[in-house]
Amino acid sequence: DDLEQAQKALDQFLKVAFRGDRPIPYYVLLQADGDNMGMIINEQETIDEHRELSRRLSTFAQKADPIVTEYHGCLIYAGGEDVLALLPMHTAILCAKKLADTFAQDMADFTVLDPQTNKDIRPSLSAGLAIVHHLEPLSNSLEAVRQAEKYAKSIKGKNALAITLTKRGGSERTIGGTWGTLDQRLEYFIDLFLKEDISTQAAYELETLAMTLEGSGDDNYYLPHEAISAEVRRILGRKKASRGTREVSENVVNSLSDLVESKKISVEQLADELIVARELASAYRLAGKEEKR
């Protein structure tokens, strides 16, 4: 009887808390690390300079906990420029961006000259996010976020974000790009899904197209780029938005197809980013964050 009453109480709580919707069984692991820190450390010539660098890193680590808390997360570890945290899906990107901005601001005085390019290297923070199922063994989830961070750190120039989406069925996809590019593009894609301006099926048809073309980059495709771009435009144009009740607007078709036509991203990248954005949009909607993010 006690168990039955507890289950009823839990059901009632979930109905109120989630407005009758089922809570999303996924959460985000965040792992972040400073870029080019070895070079920056080596450039400090005096004891005082090393002390000041250590002080700045310690200051950033102390700021990590309130930042993660602000975005409804839980800090697991913060030491120097390393951060590991748990976050809900609808705040993870914003939290990672706040951490990256804070790190860049705190470390701004430690710009160094790259001897190979003769250009200034500004301290930056790259982050990996892993969207994982709550029943997935933690060891697997930690490995996923480590690989996401590694992906971000492999991006030229770094100052990057990478997101790995791992589905319970075993499928996994990773997207990555620099701050100010990938995060802004995802924000636009999320808006499209929240406003029902694009069909989820379009993203999966683009993925099928990429697989058919047997490559993730334009150099691997066996069709002319113009033909690929035309097929992307055709797929986007014939898929209905708003749950099949209206056509996808010409502006949306143009904005998405232009990304491929201008070779900013490949067909596979566009498909993967749309699929990840769709998952994030579901979390935003459930959290009631459609209008303010």
Pin down the residues of each PLM region:
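Charged, helix-rich terminal subdomains or tails
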Residues: D1-E81, A85-R293
